[in-house]
């Protein structure tokens, strides 16, 4: 299945503790159906001291289900993503609310 949410997209969280917050997708895990979003779903991790890094408690992003994310259109609202095939044969994503093309 084609990816509706890709690395670098700006998304809005639909449900959960961070509902309504938006951020940029850092990484997508298609096999798990999850993604990492910058500044969303932060968890505290207890880091052990190493030669390179200090020990302590750090905040980092945890994975969030793709079903809880929606692409953010140019108006800043969540939208569904569809696919169109252009005249030259390329398959591109578009925002269903505005009809604007997302890719190339």
UniProtKB/Swiss-Prot annotation:
Query: Which cellular component appears as one GO term in the record?
Result: ribosome
* Disulphide-bridged cysteine pairs: none
Q: Which Pfam families match?
A: KOW, ribosomal_L24
| One GO BP annotation of this record | translation
Positions the record marks as coiled coil are none
SMART domains linked: KOW
Q: Which domain of life is it from?
A: Bacteria
Molecular function terms, GO-annotated: rRNA binding; structural constituent of ribosome
UniProt xrefs under Gene3D superfamilies: 2.30.30.30
Which UniProt key words apply to this protein?
Ribonucleoprotein, Ribosomal protein, RNA-binding, rRNA-binding
What family is this protein classified in?
A: Belongs to the universal ribosomal protein uL24 family.
Function according to Swiss-Prot or TrEMBL: One of two assembly initiator proteins, it binds directly to the 5'-end of the 23S rRNA, where it nucleates assembly of the 50S subunit. One of the proteins that surrounds the polypeptide exit tunnel on the outside of the subunit.
Tell me how this protein assembles.
Answer: Part of the 50S ribosomal subunit.
Protein name listed in UniProt: Large ribosomal subunit protein uL24
Q: Which organism is it from?
A: Methylorubrum populi (strain ATCC BAA-705 / NCIMB 13946 / BJ001) (Methylobacterium populi)
Its taxonomic path starts at: Bacteria, Pseudomonadati, Pseudomonadota, Alphaproteobacteria, Hyphomicrobiales
Recorded name of the encoding gene? rplX
């Amino acid at each position: 299945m084609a990816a509706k949410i890709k690395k670098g997209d700006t998304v809005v969280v639909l449900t959960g503790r961070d509902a309504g917050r938006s951020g940029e997708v850092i990484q997508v895990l298609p096999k798990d159906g999850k993604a990492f979003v910058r500044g969303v779903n932060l968890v505290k991790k207890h880091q052990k001291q190493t030669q390179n890094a200090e020990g302590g408690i750090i905040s980092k992003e945890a994975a969030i289900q793709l079903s809880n994310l929606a692409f953010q259109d140019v108006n800043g609202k969540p939208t569904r993503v569809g696919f169109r095939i252009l005249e030259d044969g390329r398959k591109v994503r578009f925002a269903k609310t505005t009809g604007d093309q997302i890719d190339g």
